[in-house]
Design a protein with these regions (language model features):
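Residue-level recognition of a conserved intra-blade site in WD40 beta-propeller repeats
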Residues: 21, 74, 130, 175-176
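A flexible loop/linker signature enriched in serine peptidases of the S9 family
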Residues: 1, 9-17, 22, 26-52, ...
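Structural motif
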Residues: 57, 77, 131-133, 143, ...
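Short coil/turn segments that connect the beta-strands within blades of beta-propeller domains
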Residues: 24-26, 77-79, 133-135
């Protein structure tokens, strides 16, 4: 495809990181540090961005979550999305990191506002993507020694299964396509 003319859809000078389109393509979800709510316990910091949505044709953006929610993946019906959290400023390239700020995968229900932690392993878990069945998801984890692709049924961390088994070089930046 030849593409089209680029159109600016946001006007804030903050760093913005695109994460996903809505399933119908009408909305872009992105992370940025624009406006932490006054009641937020997080210190405003460029690496601890909030989640925003903006119409794909441009317009006013709105804050979806005040907490860092990165690399989101919507369920087919668009009622829930998976995301990786960010609890602190650890270097994302550090290998074999286990601490209280390692990333976990969460499920967010857009109707109720409920966040449900999906991964329970103490190390890094990243880049969630809903599986076609809608009942499980794929993600990256260092649980097997280096980053590999794992699959887990929603809400069943004990049933997580390693899909790839690379030993020398980790899998980075998992993506999915139809």
């Amino acid at each position: 495809a030849s593409g089209g003319t680029p159109t600016r859809v946001t006007t804030n000078s903050a760093k913005e990181v695109p994460y996903a389109f809505s399933n119908d393509g009408s909305t872009i979800y992105f992370g940025a540090t624009i406006a932490d709510p006054a009641q937020s316990a997080l210190f405003p910091k460029g690496s601890m961005e909030e989640l925003y949505a903006v119409p794909a044709k441009g317009g006013r953006y709105e804050q979806v979550l005040a907490t860092p929610a990165q690399f989101i993946s919507f369920s087919e019906d668009g009622k829930t999305f998976l995301y990786q959290d960010r609890k602190g400023g650890e270097n994302e390239w550090r290998k074999h990191h286990t601490s209280s700020i390692t990333r976990d995968i969460w499920l967010y229900d857009t109707a109720t506002g409920k966040h449900t932690q999906q991964t329970q392993w103490e190390g890094e878990n990243r880049n969630p993507h809903f599986a076609k069945d809608g009942k499980s998801f794929y993600y990256l984890s260092e649980q097997g020694g280096t980053f590999n692709v794992w699959q887990m049924p929603i809400g069943k961390a004990s049933e997580a299964k390693q899909v790839t088994s690379f030993k020398t070089h980790p899998v980075r930046f998992l993506s999915a396509a139809d």
